[in-house]
């Protein structure tokens, strides 16, 4: 996924057969598997999807979550077809099951920077290690920026840019050799200058 630049579901769908994601903005997002899932349009704002989205076993109830950047993940599992037996409701079309990297008592750190055209730059970092003999932590960061792709002649600025920031913190408590307790928390912000729409190939836009 990293080599392909798939830092969210919208990018990852290009690598996953039968998955479609349509999004003009996070509140107006539809995700389908094999053509079924949720409608695309203003009618889906606030509605549960037919494709379940899970991160470390936690259900994200709104399709808008699929527009967020992945933060320090280890795998993406795409389950096609009804998954009610394993995941419960809202999985009539399938489910995304995402697993993040866990905190470790062994010290470690990762850092990655990517760049591209239109001022695209992405930075990812994570640090993990022991705090005490029974407590370990992991802190992760992801930031993505890109200049706008559409010139707004009224404001003299490029719009439809990317401005994403995400953080995740984990605590791992080792109660004994058979029992561990994990506490996760994350925060993600999207602050783009969008979402401009243009008429393509019909009239001159002004």
Over which residues does each language-model region extend?
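Short intrinsically disordered, low-complexity coil segments enriched in acidic
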Residues: 1-6, 96, 174, 180, ...
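Short secondary-structure transition/capping segments
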Residues: 33-37, 150-151, 194
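Flexible loop and strand-edge segments within Gram-negative outer membrane beta-barrel domains
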Residues: 180-206
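Acidic, small-polar-rich N-terminal luminal/periplasmic segments of exported/outer-membrane proteins
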Residues: 1-106
């Amino acid at each position: 996924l990293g080599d392909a630049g798939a830092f969210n579901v919208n990018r990852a769908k290009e690598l996953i057969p039968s998955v479609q994601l349509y999004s003009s903005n996070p509140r107006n997002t539809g995700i389908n598997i094999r053509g079924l899932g949720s409608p695309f349009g203003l009618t889906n704002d606030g509605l549960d999807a037919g494709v379940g989205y899970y991160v470390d076993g936690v259900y994200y109830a709104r399709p808008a979550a699929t527009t967020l950047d992945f933060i320090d993940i280890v795998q993406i599992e795409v389950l096609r077809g009804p998954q009610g037996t394993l995941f419960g409701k809202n999985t009539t079309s399938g489910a995304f099951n995402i697993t993040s990297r866990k905190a470790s008592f062994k010290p470690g750190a990762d850092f990655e920077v990517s760049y591209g055209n239109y001022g695209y730059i992405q930075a990812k970092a994570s640090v993990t290690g022991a705090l005490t003999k029974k407590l370990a932590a992991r802190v992760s960061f992801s930031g993505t920026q890109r200049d706008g792709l559409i010139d707004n002649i009224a404001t003299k600025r490029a719009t439809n840019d990317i401005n994403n920031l995400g953080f995740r913190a984990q605590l791992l408590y080792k109660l004994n050799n058979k029992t561990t307790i994990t506490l996760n928390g994350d925060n993600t912000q999207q602050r783009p200058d969008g979402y401009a729409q243009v008429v393509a190939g019909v009239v001159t836009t002004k």
